[in-house]
Every structure is written in C-alpha cells, then in structure tokens.
C-alpha cells in the first residue's frame, strides 16, 4: 500500500465510498422530512387545537411557566442571543458535527449513534403527522412571545428557514430529543470530567433554549426526552437479541 493510501485509510475508517453513503442516508432523511412537513402543514386548525390542548393541560397541572421563563430571558440581551443561537444550531450543526467527530474518532460507536438518531427522528416525524401542534409563539394571547421574531435577525420567516422548517412541529421537541441522544453518546466517548459534565448539561440547556424562545412547551421537551430514551432502549434490546442469536 502506498504512503498516500495508508494516510487516507487512517483518516477515513472505511473509505470514501462509505463516507459518501452516510451523506446519502441523511439526504434521504431530509427528503422524507419534507414529505412529512407537507402533510403536517395541511391541518392548520388541528395544529392550533392541539396547541391549545397542550396549554390547557399544562395550566390544569399548574405548570404553565413558559411565559415567566420567557420574560426572564428576554430581559437579558446575552441570554436572548445564547438561546437564539442554540435553537438554530443545536439540531443540525451540533448533530452534524458530533456525527462527523464520532465517525472519525470513535468509529465503532458511529453506527449505533446514527441509527438511534434516524429511528428517533422518524418516529418523531410520524408524531408530526398524527398530532401537528402549533408552538407557544403562535399564542400571544396566553402571554407567549416569539423571541426570534422580535429580537433576532434570523427568524422563521427568513427565506431558507421558512422553506425548510415545519411551523407546526412542536410535539415532540426533536431539538430536545436530538440533544439528549447527542449528550448521552458524547458523554460515553469523551474522556475529561469537564467535557462529560458539559455534554450531560447539553440537553437541559437545549430544552431551556427552545422553551425560552417560544418554540416549545415543556411537555414537548419532556416528550422528546422520553422518545429518545424509549428508542434507545428498543434499539439496545434489539441489538442484544441479535447478538444472542448470531
């Protein structure tokens, strides 16, 4: 093997074709997402009914605290900036970068990480079709604020974002779900105690960010966390059963 080939082998655990295939998988998922988005967007009245149901349920539980959280965050320009960037970057940029990092640095963990994200997101997308839900920012009469619309130059009406996002995708919170999956996987592969602590805190911070920007109810966040844990458990048990019968 030539020196160049040896260096490429070290950089790419399974070669260029395998890496390209991973990108194709995510492109396929994006196509599926757009199809689901189109289906969920049609039932606008249902999305608002479901959003009101979530609000009334939380109110009945005595836990409609999101407007209070929003007022606290909106009083600080630093918190508004941090939570806004977290909302925009956590689901795609952070997920994408951690996938690449695990692919190159801990390749033996990559397939499990990828599969967990894909399965959990597909289940979440089914939820968007069955239960489209308008987010808090669409209910100003309840005291919610569209933080991104008021304070950020990038908001849900911005060109590419308006095209690519689903406005009625509150339940469950895929931001929170993905953040928990990323946090668990990264906790398992990083070495320093500080890094482990930061990755454990990551899903909690993302949950706080999506609530404080008016994009999710706390029930959405809880549902996202539960979905992440359930799909992870199912995949783990499936893998163990497969190994036993191998």
Predicted region positions:
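N-terminal transmembrane-helix/juxtamembrane module of multi-pass inner/ER membrane proteins
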Residues: 2-93
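Aromatic-anchored segments of alpha-helical transmembrane domains
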Residues: 31, 35, 121-130, 201-212
């Amino acid at each position: 093997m030539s020196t160049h080939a040896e260096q490429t082998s070290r950089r790419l655990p399974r070669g260029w074709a395998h890496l390209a295939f991973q990108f194709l998988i995510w492109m396929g998922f994006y196509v599926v997402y757009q199809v689901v988005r189109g289906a969920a967007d049609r039932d606008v009245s249902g999305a608002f009914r479901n959003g009101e149901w979530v609000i009334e349920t939380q109110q009945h539980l005595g836990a409609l605290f999101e407007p209070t959280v929003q007022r606290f965050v909106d009083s600080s320009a630093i918190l508004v900036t941090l939570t806004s960037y977290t909302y925009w970057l956590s689901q795609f940029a952070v997920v994408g970068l951690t996938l690449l990092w695990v692919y190159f640095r801990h390749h033996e963990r990559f397939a499990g990480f990828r599969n967990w994200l894909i399965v959990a997101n597909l289940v979440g997308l089914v939820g968007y079709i069955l239960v489209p839900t308008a987010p808090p920012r669409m209910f100003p009469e309840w005291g919610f604020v569209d933080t991104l619309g008021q304070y950020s130059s990038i908001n849900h009406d911005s060109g590419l974002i308006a095209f690519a996002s689903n406005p009625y995708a509150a339940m469950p919170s895929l931001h929170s779900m993905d953040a928990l999956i990323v946090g668990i996987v990264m906790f398992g592969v990083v070495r320093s105690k500080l890094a482990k602590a930061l990755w454990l805190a990551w899903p909690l911070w993302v949950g706080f960010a999506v609530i404080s920007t008016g994009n999710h109810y706390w029930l959405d966040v809880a549902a996202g966390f539960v979905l992440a844990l359930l799909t992870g458990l199912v995949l783990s048990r499936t893998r163990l059963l497969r190994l036993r019968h191998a």
